[in-house]
Amino acid sequence: MSKVLIEEQSDQGMAKRIINHSGLSVGQLVTKHGSGNIDKLIPKLSRTTASNPWVVFRDSDTRCPVELREQLTKSTTVNPAFLLRIVHPMTEGWLMADPQSFSQYFKITAKKVPVDTELLPHAKHSLLALCKKSRSRDIRGDIVRPDGSTGPLYVSRINEFAENYWDIATAAQNSPSLNRALVRLAELRSFLMNQ
């Protein structure tokens, strides 16, 4: 069982789904409400042991994932029981990288879903803008308020989509950062099984 650290509650479905898809299980899911709170914990978590593995999902917020990872881990040593995955640009981008399932669930024309979600300046804003034009009144009301901010059921709808409808394999074909995360999670699983 892995402990998993995420930024926001709306990342829970994505994290659980990816961990389970990778053949691992979530022992504890911790939400830290913002990347700054996660960044402070990375040096400590990176010293974990195989009996207490940690997986951290942190949004890149449009920064170069490679440079961000180097900055966040420069004072740590490589530890195979610790995995930091940079979600590029953010969770909503990974979810939209499966345009077929995304368009069906959120009742949006598939051709309106961005092809390369890693190029979006702000994936969450893009998702909200798409959902504002949903054919479903329920989706519009749940996901986005009239002023464009997140709606009252944003978190539960995003998590429901991630856990039950999101096709990770399709999304990984469209999102290099998601594909890399799956590769690293497979390596973590292999390491833990050999301990």
PLM regions: where:
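A short, flexible N-terminal coil/short beta segment enriched in small residues
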Residues: 1-7
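Conserved helicase motor
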Residues: 32-35
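C-terminal accessory helical subdomains adjacent to catalytic cores in phosphodiester-
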Residues: 2, 12-28, 39-55, 60-195
